[in-house]
Swiss-Prot record:
PANTHER family: RIBONUCLEASE H2 SUBUNIT A, RIBONUCLEASE HII. Gene3D superfamilies: Ribonuclease H-like superfamily/Ribonuclease H. Pfam families: RNase_HII (PF01351). Residues 72-256 form the RNase H type-2 domain. It comes from Limosilactobacillus fermentum (strain NBRC 3956 / LMG 18251) (Lactobacillus fermentum). This is Ribonuclease HII.
Amino acid sequence: MSKQSVAQVRALLSSITDPQDPRLAEFKDDPRKGVQAALNQFAKRLEKRAEARAAFLNRFRYENQLWQAGHQYVAGIDEVGRGPLAGPVVTCAVVLDSQFDLVGVTDSKQLSRHEREQLYLRILDEAVEVSLAVSPAQEIDRLNIYAATQTAMIRSVKALHHQPSHLIVDAVPLDIPVPQTTLIKGDQKSISVAAASIVAKEYRDHLMAIYDRLYPGYGFKDNMGYGTAAHLAGLEQLGACPIHRRTFRPVPDYVN
């Protein structure tokens, strides 16, 4: 029978990652309800971790298939910022290798700000290569949002030091002479596209925080350019600023 206190057992269980750890057998024979409750929590943590690992490996299937087909340099492409009334579209291209093991990487919209910030730094450190590109509001107004997004995505691919032999693109096919796999909701299906979505999101959020200081009164650091009540109130009071998209309603109503 375990001689540790329930609190000590709970602390030990929090550090165990191997389901075959011999200490677990001892804890299972411990009749104390607190120990058994801690074991149940431990089992649930292991199950959740296994599910996360399985989902991670599933999101790696497109990359693995392409590597096995001989495409050593595969880039995942995603964008952030198609819907806001203000600010640029930001696109990112990320190249990973088979050693990449950040299980938490998934669609940036499913992550908390803290999770994104942590993963962003890890992706920059562990990816083979990362490149970013932007399409500013003026270009969006000139081309339309879809064409501007395509243009920025192509820029992010061309900015890579080594040109990829295959692209995995979130939803938007690109007019570029590189073989492509286009995935609807690609940031939920491909790990490299998910990594690109995280980097693009963090970079754009940082830009919008800078714009918030340059153009106060619209709440850009909080709404990221989306049409929130505070943003619309700022438009009503101040009119449109240089980063507003003049072709996105209701912005034209506030252009001086």
